[in-house]
């Protein structure tokens, strides 16, 4: 499935209902990934300006949580307003499915600590980047007096398992060239080779 959803460009009422339905269908196995996204597409296609993005993101996220936890929710916000909206069924997980943030900038990492339940490192970031981000997160968690043991971390990793190491590298380079327009990124952020070699790394 997708790594993160962008709450800034979604209707939060419809999104809350869709995610709650997924949690019901999966019998409580949903983890919600949210991200800030890049500004250019959001402004050009959805009319969300740079100065609105942060406020829309937080407001949308708060609406999700309100609809998941309250019998009837009322919101008087900057971007969305509604009165006594009931959403059923509620998620299986209580109070709601864990919300993990995808972020790499300090402001996004702080947002994750303030509003999230976990964090995932981007697949396009290197191991060195990941270590740096984890260090910042640990600091922000400490400043917020949050227990790091209750804030799980993860990293998406691109892997090509093939006993022919050269062929595995070619496949990754081709995929990164198509997806990111940067074939060399594959070498910086991926694992490839036999199963044993990948596990060893």
Spans of model-derived segments:
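Active-site-adjacent structural elements that line small-molecule/cofactor binding pockets in enzymes
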Residues: 1-201
